[in-house]
Swiss-Prot record:
Pfam family, one: CENP-N
Protein name: Inner kinetochore subunit CHL4
UniProt keyword annotation of Nucleus present: yes
Lineage of the organism: Eukaryota, Fungi, Dikarya, Ascomycota, Saccharomycotina
GO biological process: attachment of spindle microtubules to kinetochore; cell division; CENP-A containing chromatin assembly; chromosome segregation; establishment of meiotic sister chromatid cohesion; establishment of mitotic sister chromatid cohesion; kinetochore assembly; maintenance of meiotic sister chromatid cohesion
Family designation: Belongs to the CENP-N/CHL4 family.
Organism annotation: Saccharomyces cerevisiae (strain ATCC 204508 / S288c) (Baker's yeast)
Superkingdom: Eukaryota
Amino acid sequence: MSNELRLEDNYVPTSDTLVVFKQLMKLPVTVLYDLTLSWFAKFGGSFDGDIYLLTETLDLLIEKGVRRNVIVNRILYVYWPDGLNVFQLAEIDCHLMISKPEKFKWLPSKALRGDGKPYVVKLQPAKFIENLQTDLAKIYHCHVYMFKHPSLPVLITRIQLFDSNNLFLSTPNIGSINKESLYNKLDKFQGKPLISRRPYYVAFPLNSPIIFHSVDKDIYARLVLQSISRTISERETIIFKPVQKIPVKSIHNIMTLLGPSRFAESMGPWECYASANFERSPLHDYKKHQGLTGKKVMVREFDDSFLNDDENFYGKEEPEIRRLRLEKNMIKFKGSANGVMDQKYNDLKEFNEHVHNIRNGKKNEDSGEPVYISRYSSLVPIEKVGFTLKNEINSRIITIKLKFNGNDIFGGLHELCDKNLINIDKVPGWLAGENGSFSGTIMNGDFQREQVAKGGLL
């Protein structure tokens, strides 16, 4: 039965052509070009010619500067008019994850052994896909696709389940269905078109016990994680325990916060230690050391007009005092006097060159919306975090709860400090972002990370 429920890569599911069209229109032309050729080489198509002729045709279209919709229409209505198969749809979704990472949110979980010790997940991709698909296919029609992220040390798995009419996933007492009844229902609905669930993603950072997965928390999501747990439990039982409740936007951000990165435990004022900016290497030219050359007094010009204004919230301020105060704020929130603008700009530039450039090296003018970086932009923007302050006063525990929401919480607090609306000397480390995306409790000044509900996903 399980072999019958496994969907091969060439299976063409029922899909809305308009939805697929919109998805393809979000991809850069260079990606559409590469996908068309790789799909034709793998599956063939309705194009009247071989792959060499198809390559020449696409090259000619790009040289003429045709719009993106021309290539998309050819993919959907000329090369594969009967519809795209599950492999092609999976590749579209995964390329969207690469080119538009901010559209995907992730939750972290930790793999634990039976004794509670962390388990570093090490996968053999082909074997893992085979075993996972076999396990899932005991109940669902399924398709599994895995790829290595082009710029991050992480393997990302896309799992999609199908059923005839959402029968199983919508059944409230799904756990009580016995195998005989389940197989009877499978046979009954086998002839009907399959309905797909939203794809579920699981990312496996290399050499790490932490995995990242989609934010879904329904029965479907739990069953997928349980199946993955069984698949990797070869010699001992492995469970996944949630690490935090608040999702993180973008695979890049969560890899920096919780992946195998030096920044994972060095956020806020400690970022300089992760990027090795706290001191010059002994291999550098000692003649250029700041102790001999002195320190420049000039401040880099920014668009923020208030930075060059002698007047502030507390009245007139001397230029040198203002410079030192702004530098102190920058070190508090970003870990160094230079901040992270250059690093974010270089990362963004490298990302755009990797994803958005046309194959012939020319810039794609329609590559997406502009992204603005300010001096306050955090290395990893945190959008939601909460703190609970507890202090004992006169033998009573006083509790204050703080909840922050925004595009870049700690970047905003940094800006308020620059405007002198917050006294930087009164800002504790946990309010400067040193704990990353973690919420927690501050008991008598000590930060304690928020504990997620006990138990794990077996």
